[in-house]
Amino acid sequence: MDNKIVGILGGGQLGRMIVEAANRLNIKTVVLDVPNSPAKQINSNEHVDGSFTDLKSIIQLAEKCDILTVEIEHVDVEALKYVKEKFGVEIYPLPDTIKLIQDKYLQKEHLIQHGISVTESVAVPSNDEQSLIEIGNKFNYPFMLKSRTLAYDGRGNYVVKTKESIPEALEFLKDRPLYAEKWCPFNKELAVMVVRSIEGEVFAYPTVETIHKNNICHVVYAPARVSDSIAVKASVLAKNAVKSFPGCGIFGVEMFLLPNNEILINEIAPRPHNSGHYTIDACVTSQFEAHVRAVVGLPMPKNFTSLSTTTTNAIMLNVLGDEESNKELEICRRALETPNASVYLYGKSTRPNRKMGHINIVSSSMEDCESRLDYIIGKSSKIPENLIPKEKPLVSIIMGSDSDLPVMSVGANILKRFGVPFELTIVSAHRTPHRMTQYAIEAPKRGLKVIIAGAGGAAHLPGMVAAMTPLPVIGVPVKGSTLDGVDSLHSIVQMPRGIPVATVAINNSTNAALLAVRILGAYDYKWLNEMNQYMNNMENEVLAKAERLEEVGYEKY
């Protein structure tokens, strides 16, 4: 695919999966790490035995390669700058980007300068009790004390619960540069993998939800169990953050979702990330292949970061070393018995809480994924069968008041007769304007294809919804108590140019539903065939009536 040789600083599980992705593209890789590291186990090329923090070892790697990249950010950045200048080797992410992200406090300062929302933090000027007491007075207790550098999987974090716990915190994090974060109570932890091309374009994978146990990522839900608006908000924030760093590659962006729905960035990793392992099985292109494409300069086609299908759901479970040697393999065996589950082991010797591998579960519903997860972790004893996923509604029937229900339920019964999945609810343009706005904007993201809106009187609902959604809207004028529905008809049908509303006769939700089925039939032959059958049935009914009338005469008919 490309004759450039890629050198990888770090041979752990992330390096191993980068190598796997590069191998499929016939791209040669050379790994710098200790002998028999996970990445070296699956690659027969001549590697470099040494440390990614050692200048001599990095020089050896640079002499063999055209491009250098990292699977861990804790590398010798000055050595990278040296080999870049001496050998002309390309390095991605750029050394300055790696250096900035290495120091978590400087990382936050950089993001703030670029208008990115982060958790409030302050540098610890001196590792002594008085400095932390002053921070406690500023932030109150508890607050989070963190190492600025060389922190990973929660190592380097300490919760300062009270003033009395300060000496213990200093002992725990002694001899490290520190910073403190104001305590951030959050509802969920979210993450987004973002790919940055050398031209500066950014592409986001779906927003996911991460569950941590003992500061280590335990489970990832993809997509995140949040509203579409929250997922989009997190994606935009993550992309804006990654845009601020020069160079290319993949970045893992971890975030907090607060109770008020505000989203703050926790930290960023300039490499593949644990929260993106699900992409191997659930997405068009894995995070590892995306990283290889970015650093080598290969094409990034449209939607390459998307989930494989619009109904794809996935759960990633980390496999951690158990207190009892190799006991974690019991989970892997159960996963091997489970349909739609894939096991990835990293070739490591076991020790407690060490990342030994991960398991991806992919299905058409999150409910099904969770059922399989329960069996794998031992919460249930029965291997789950395939669950029939609940059909997502294709048509929405909305009305301004429950008094419109007798009219709109007729259309609902038509959709039911055709087997079209639909939802029916009340959305008032005047009494619930915020709900109407949110409903109209989010409708396409939820998979809806057509909206039927019934309204009487002023009848603003169909037009207002049509103004805020790209979906086709069908208006049903509902007969009122004063002007027999003519006012509603005129209101709906007289929409300004550019805001189309297909309007049916007064109280005729039947035709609205039939029109919705025809719209669905324009892109899905299933509904086209159903409509053809419906029309044939109507014809047969009329022909049968005509035949009987002609046979018995009008007097006996």
From Swiss-Prot:
Its EC number is 4.1.1.21. Residues 108-296 form the ATP-grasp domain. Signal peptide: none annotated. One of its GO terms (molecular function) is ATP binding. InterPro entries: Ade2_fungi/plant (IPR016301), ATP-grasp (IPR011761), ATP-grasp_carboxylate-amine (IPR003135), ATP_grasp_subdomain_1 (IPR013815), PreATP-grasp_dom_sf (IPR016185), PurE_ClassI (IPR033747), PurE_dom (IPR000031), PurK (IPR005875). The keyword ATP-binding applies. It holds the Pfam family RS_preATP-grasp-like. Pathway: Purine metabolism; IMP biosynthesis via de novo pathway; 5-amino-1-(5-phospho-D-ribosyl)imidazole-4-carboxylate from 5-amino-1-(5-phospho-D-ribosyl)imidazole (carboxylase route): step 1/1. ATP binds at residues 136-191. SUPFAM superfamilies: Glutathione synthetase ATP-binding domain-like (SSF56059), N5-CAIR mutase (phosphoribosylaminoimidazole carboxylase, PurE) (SSF52255), PreATP-grasp domain (SSF52440), Rudiment single hybrid motif (SSF51246). SMART domains: AIRC. Keywords: ATP-binding, Decarboxylase, Lyase, Nucleotide-binding, Purine biosynthesis. One of its GO terms (biological process) is 'de novo' IMP biosynthetic process. It comes from the Eukaryota. PROSITE patterns: ATP_GRASP (PS50975). In the C-terminal section; belongs to the AIR carboxylase family. Class I subfamily. This is Phosphoribosylaminoimidazole carboxylase. It comes from Schwanniomyces occidentalis (Yeast). The gene is ADE2.
